[in-house]
Amino acid sequence: MTSFDQVTSLSAALLQCLCNAVSGHPGAPGHCAYRVGTEPVHDINLDGIDLCCEGLAYVMLGDTYPSSDSFPDNDIVRQGDNPCVPPGWAINYRVGIVRCASDPGDDTSQAAAFTQGLYDMLSLNETWCCFRDYVRSTPQFLGMSLVLERQVPGSTSGGCTERYFRMAVQIPNVDCCPN
């Protein structure tokens, strides 16, 4: 097993948790998928699909760095000659939901968007709980840590709005120390 296998397993579980969570609430996004980069692309794609207004629930892989004793902070690896340093990696994710922004001049539209935002908040909370349970029940991740950052609304731009959270997941270093 390598870090590729571990992160593939974590990512699949996280996406499944997210897709299950959003599908259980009104206004489920039309798309639930991985995204790459630093910001999810959610405007009209080349096929003319408006991912923003159809709704997009996403999981993005972020930074990866050595982190064990100071998790979730980056370790300073001073023992580079030790074959098993670092003992762990931090894997960062961003998990979110993108939607059409409501009409700022229409109170009814704003109230509906506010209610949908509450469902999105609940979906992201449920995603976190599901993923935490997955990590806790998977033997290869026993003793590893999770750090959940705050859930935040993104800026409203291009007619879209977003809610997301970031988290760091610790995995054992099986790349430098396979045994």
Regions found by a protein language model. Give the residues of each.
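Short, charged interaction patches at domain edges and termini
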Residues: 1-32, 86-90, 134-179
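Feature targets compositionally biased, intrinsically disordered low-complexity regions
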Residues: 36, 54, 61, 116, ...
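Short, internal active-site loops enriched in acidic
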Residues: 39-41, 100, 151-155
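A broad, low-specificity signal marking well-ordered, structured residues that form hydrophobic/aromatic
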Residues: 54-58, 93, 165
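A generic short-segment signal for beta-strand/edge and adjacent turn/coil regions
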Residues: 59-66, 128-140
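Generic structural motif
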Residues: 64, 98-102, 170-174
